[in-house]
Amino acid sequence: MKMTFRWYGKDDPISLEYIKQIPGMKGIVSAIYDVPVGEVWPLDKIKALKQEIEDAGMELSVIESVPVHEDIKLGKPTRDKYIENYCETLRNLGQAGIKIVCYNFMPVFDWTRSQLDYRLDDGSTCLIYDEQDVEKMNPLSGELSLPGWDSSYTKEDLKQLFDDYKEVDEETLWDNLNYFIQKVIPVAEEEDVLMAIHPDDPPWNIFGLPRIITNKENLERFINLYDSKYNGLTMCSGSLGADRRNDFVDMLRYFGEKGRVNFVHARNVKLIGDKSFQESAHLSEKGSIDMYEVVKTLHSFDYHGPIRPDHGRMIWGETGKPGYGLYDRALGATYLNGLYEAVSKNNK
């Protein structure tokens, strides 16, 4: 496996120089952040980002993500224009030599948490999802904001989107996802760009909005929409592992042996209720996921693709984007590399 690290570009307080100093770090996961959702990413911007990362001694391993416009998810008549723009972006990424694109199909909101600075017993802070707190939230107030959300939505935009989604149930969302996949994956095949859909985070419906990339059955349904390695998965241990009904290691092995795991997000979560969890340190004993078994499974199907430590705690007084500090993710990367070395040497 190839260790990578999420970087938010020039506005990220964590420099490429610091990321390069993490032992075993090979690549960067990033995106173009100043192009509005639905517009084509210019080739020159992609090449400039790639060159900046290569000049720092690493490679641009994964684009995360090329966002999918809401009109596509809603199945509006305008979707064809946005799908063609998406395909043109993939062509530009392919021309620039980008090989993997992570994306999601979550309506309106990306990953969702109820608190960004929950204090753990050791004094560190972490992201937490408390079902009761989320149920009390009003997403239409315009006051909620999380690092993964599209900040361009106004209060009026959100109200309109929620009105639009009243007509979209899970099966309609599946239909709209299938329409998107049938148009996009042939272009990905032509450009040799592996697509890797990210599971919904958390993997259940929120705020009355449908979510469908949530469990083994639905991931199987997804890959069967278009039978190609280019129609693949981002296997995120924290997202899928947040639902105690999901056996993440079993899912990882199953889809890995099918050759459909194109990217891996590795993080741990501690389950504290049926639909409540804390994000923990990567160490197995700190959470509910056995990270040794995760890495052992990756080795078992000879995974050579990119992996990145996902959301970390804030430790040692660090401040910045919640979940995306340097220190805990660097510890996570080193821990994962250590596990992989041990598994590899033990299986020679």
UniProtKB/Swiss-Prot annotation:
Gene, per the UniProt record: uxuA
Pathway: Carbohydrate metabolism; pentose and glucuronate interconversion
Annotated catalysed reactions: D-mannonate = 2-dehydro-3-deoxy-D-gluconate + H2O
Family assignment from sequence similarity: Belongs to the mannonate dehydratase family.
Keywords for this protein: Iron, Lyase, Manganese
Pfam family, one: UxuA
EC number: 4.2.1.8
Source organism phylogeny: Bacteria, Bacillati, Bacillota, Bacilli, Bacillales
Record's protein name: Mannonate dehydratase
UniProt-listed GO biological process terms: D-glucuronate catabolic process
Role according to the record: Catalyzes the dehydration of D-mannonate.
Presence of the UniProt keyword Iron in the record: yes
Cysteines joined through disulfide linkages: none
